[in-house]
Amino acid sequence: MNNNKVIKKVTVVGAGFVGSTTAYTLMLSGLISEIVLIDINAKKADGEVMDLNHGMPFVRPVEIYRGDYKDCAGSDIVIITAGANQKEGETRIDLVKRNTEVFKNIINEIVKYNNDCILLVVTNPVDILTYVTYKLSGFPKNKVIGSGTVLDTARFRYLLSEHVKVDARNVHAYIIGEHGDTEVAAWSLANIAGIPMDRYCDECHQCEEQISRNKIYESVKNAAYEIIRNKGATYYAVALAVRRIVEAIVRNENSILTVSSLLEGQYGLSDVCLSVPTIVGVNGIEEILNVPFNDEEIQLLRKSGNTLKEIIKTLDI
C-alpha cells in the first residue's frame, strides 16, 4: 500500500522478557531505524541494549539505546510491555488492578512527551489495559491498539495446521473476544483454501483422527498457562505477534489482524476493547470489520465483552 508517512522510531516500555524479545524481533525485521528501550530497572535495560547492539554487524543498521520517558518524543509507535508478571495459576484478569495502577504512571509519562504516536499495548490483561490506555491517554480510538488475540489466532492456526498437515500460513481461522479465558474460536469461518475445515478433513485424507474442536480450543486457551508452568513466561511468539502488528502499521499494509480496539456498536458491544478481525495500517485501526460469525459465536463474543465490562466498572479510571 502507498505510505506517505515514514515510521522510523519505536519505543518499547518494559525491558522484561516480552519487551526485550520484542526489541530483538524489531531489530531483525529491518523495519525500524531507531529503537528505544525504557525500564524502571536501568541496569537491566542497559544489559539488554548492550546484548542487542553486539549483534549489529549481522543486521541492517538500526540505532538501539536505553532511554527515559522523554525519549518517547518523536516516536511513531510506543509499545507497552511493562507491568506485573502473570504468576502460575493466575488468570489474566487477576492481574488487572495491579497493572491498572502501573499504567496510570506509564501513560501519564508517555503523553507528557508524545501525544501523536500509536500506542500498542501488550501487557496483560491486554483488552482491559487497552481500554485503560484509551481512557487515560485521551488519544483517538484508532491510535490505541492491543495485541489482542493475534497470538491466540496464530496458536489456533498452528494447531489446525498440525492436525491437517498444511502450512500454517494457509490456514484461515480466528480467535476473537478476550485474550484470555472467555476467548472464542470462530469455527464457522475456519477454512483451508476456502474449504470449510470439517469438509477439508473429510476430503484430505491426511488427518490421523477426527478433529476435536474442544481439544484444540482448550489447547489454545490454556497455552500460556502451560508455557508459564514449564518455563516461567511466554515471550517468543508474542514478540513475533507484536512485530507483525508493527509491520502492518509501518508498511501501511491494511492487513487484517485480530487486534484489540474500542468497539462502538459492532457485534452489539460498546465501550469495551475486544479482538475481532480489523484492518491495520499506518493510522493504526483503519476499520473494524463486520464478519458474519454464526449466532453462537456472536453470543459468546458478547458474553466475553460483557464479562470485561463488569471488571472495568471496578477500576478507578
UniProtKB/Swiss-Prot annotation:
The lineage of its organism: Bacteria, Bacillati, Bacillota, Clostridia, Eubacteriales. Belongs to the LDH/MDH superfamily. LDH family. Substrate binds at residues 86, 92, 124-127, 152-155, 234. This is L-lactate dehydrogenase. One of its GO terms (cellular component) is cytoplasm. It is an enzyme of class 1 (oxidoreductase). It catalyses: (S)-lactate + NAD(+) = pyruvate + NADH + H(+). InterPro entries: L-lactate/malate_DH, L-lactate_DH, L-lactate_DH_AS, Lactate/malate_DH_C, Lactate/malate_DH_N, Lactate_DH/Glyco_Ohase_4_C, NAD(P)-bd_dom_sf. It holds the Pfam family Ldh_1_C. SUPFAM superfamilies: LDH C-terminal domain-like, NAD(P)-binding Rossmann-fold domains. One of its GO terms (biological process) is glycolytic process. The modification Phosphotyrosine is found at residue 225. The keyword Cytoplasm applies. Keywords: Allosteric enzyme, Cytoplasm, NAD, Oxidoreductase, Phosphoprotein. NAD(+) binds at residues 18, 39, 44, 69, 83-84, 122-124, 147. Beta-D-fructose 1,6-bisphosphate binds at residues 157, 172. Its EC number is 1.1.1.27. It comes from Acetivibrio thermocellus (strain ATCC 27405 / DSM 1237 / JCM 9322 / NBRC 103400 / NCIMB 10682 / NRRL B-4536 / VPI 7372) (Clostridium thermocellum). Allosterically activated by fructose 1,6-bisphosphate (FBP). It is found in: Cytoplasm. Catalyzes the conversion of lactate to pyruvate.
